[in-house]
């Protein structure tokens, strides 16, 4: 998906609330060597601002397949986002996607990580590292960004009191801003963002760019420690 088609989506899909499913491949910075002109890091923000648009960002092959089935059965416009990089297939093969319902992957008490897309895998690795240091992460897989599972977000943060949001997207318009706004209204807590801060991408391998832009598991670990210092 490029910005050039956003007006068509707004006028022909969003405004009419038509039953159209938009499947966007190669989203985010990990498109890699194609560089900034091909790396879409603002798409979630653009799509979730459209009234009535459902936005889904699955984390692996199994969840993508389940999300595709759920989307086909859903009435109304949907934006389904796919990444390019290969990630381990860690979700159960028979696990269904319920649109608007987050999945708790790890139970914890110290900090909540809300992750979406393939950064869920990075968050799993970060949680394992942190557990070895005595920090217990609650990891929530936010496959549906809109409608956000507000109940799951508030309940988790009320328990842990600290938040890290991880996504392959700009801070502006992304999951992190959405979560922070919800918490400001209902359950104030310190929040750190593992996302891209107001800049375009560049050419490089996916792994190089993940590290350069602070989206890898090591960056999530650092953000967790930073937010814990603010509790």
Mark where each language-model region is.
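Thiamine diphosphate
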Residues: 31-32, 84-231
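Conserved thiamine diphosphate
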Residues: 1-112
């Amino acid at each position: 998906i490029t910005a050039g088609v956003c007006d068509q989506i707004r006028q022909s899909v969003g405004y009419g609330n038509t039953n159209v499913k938009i499947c966007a491949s190669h989203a985010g910075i990990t498109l890699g060597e194609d560089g900034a002109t091909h790396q879409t890091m603002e798409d979630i923000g653009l799509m979730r601002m459209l009234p009535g648009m459902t936005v889904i960002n699955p984390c692996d092959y199994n969840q993508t397949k389940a999300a595709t089935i759920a989307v086909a059965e859903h009435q109304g416009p949907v934006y389904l986002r796919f990444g390019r990089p290969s990630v381990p297939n860690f979700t159960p093969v028979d696990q269904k996607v319920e649109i608007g319902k987050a999945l708790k992957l790890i139970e914890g008490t110290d900090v909540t990580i809300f992750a979406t897309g393939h950064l869920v895998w990075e968050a799993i690795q970060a949680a394992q590292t942190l557990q070895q240091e005595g920090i217990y992460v609650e990891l929530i897989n936010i496959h549906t960004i809109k409608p956000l599972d507000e109940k799951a977000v508030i309940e988790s943060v009320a328990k842990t009191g600290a938040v890290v949001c991880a996504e392959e997207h700009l801070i502006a318009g992304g999951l992190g801003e959405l979560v922070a706004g919800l918490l400001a209204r209902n359950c104030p807590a310190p929040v750190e963002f593992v996302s891209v801060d107001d800049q375009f991408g560049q050419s490089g391998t996916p792994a190089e760019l993940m590290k350069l832009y602070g989206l890898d598991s090591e960056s999530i670990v650092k953000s967790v420690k930073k937010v814990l210092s603010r509790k």
